[in-house]
């Protein structure tokens, strides 16, 4: 691959990732979701994984600790997330969804699925599989673990 091709493909990848996030943020804002995209990622991961430490959650949502702390503070204030003492380590805590948080995830999940479908609406299954294969290869080239 030439330097120009590499620059062009890198630009396209970055531009597309930014557009997907921008579109999602616009939909969240105009759709009265009461959470941001980043807050949703936290809620979704807590919903799928149960009790997590802040470090475990940070790794899942790719956020540093100060950023995640701010997000968690807001979600706790809204009543969606609760910090509970860790059963084995009194110095730390675990995070979990409250009943209100579970209800929020249940209510938002179908709406968010519709937002995600927008990006893929004109792609065939074969396009999607090839795209996934290429992204997985790039991710692994940079030291990431393969995801299912």
Map each language-model feature to its residues:
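C-terminal regulatory/oligomerization modules of transcriptional regulators
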Residues: 1-5, 126-148
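The alpha-helix within a helix-turn-helix
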Residues: 58
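N-terminal positioning helix adjacent to the helix-turn-helix/winged-helix DNA-binding module
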Residues: 9, 38-39, 100
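Helix-turn-helix DNA-binding elements, focusing on the entry/boundary residues of the two helices
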Residues: 54
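Short amphipathic alpha-helical boundary/capping segments
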Residues: 26-35, 117-124
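N-terminal leader segment of winged-helix/HTH proteins
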Residues: 1-31, 45
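Charged, amphipathic alpha-helical coiled-coil/dimerization segments
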Residues: 51, 73-133
């Amino acid at each position: 691959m030439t330097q120009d091709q590499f620059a062009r493909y890198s630009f396209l990848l970055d531009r597309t990732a930014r557009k997907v996030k921008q579109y999602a943020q616009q939909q969240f804002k105009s759709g009265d979701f009461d959470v941001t995209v980043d807050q949703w990622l936290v809620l979704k991961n807590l919903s799928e994984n149960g009790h997590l430490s802040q470090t475990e959650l940070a790794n899942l949502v790719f956020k540093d600790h100060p950023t995640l702390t701010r997000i968690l503070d807001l979600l706790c204030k809204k009543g969606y997330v609760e910090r509970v003492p860790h059963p084995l380590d009194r110095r730390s805590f675990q995070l979990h969804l409250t009943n209100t948080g579970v209800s929020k995830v249940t209510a938002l999940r179908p709406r968010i699925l519709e937002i995600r479908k927008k990006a893929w609406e004109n792609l065939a299954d074969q396009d999607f599989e090839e795209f996934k294969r290429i992204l997985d290869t790039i991710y692994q080239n940079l030291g990431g673990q393969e995801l299912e």
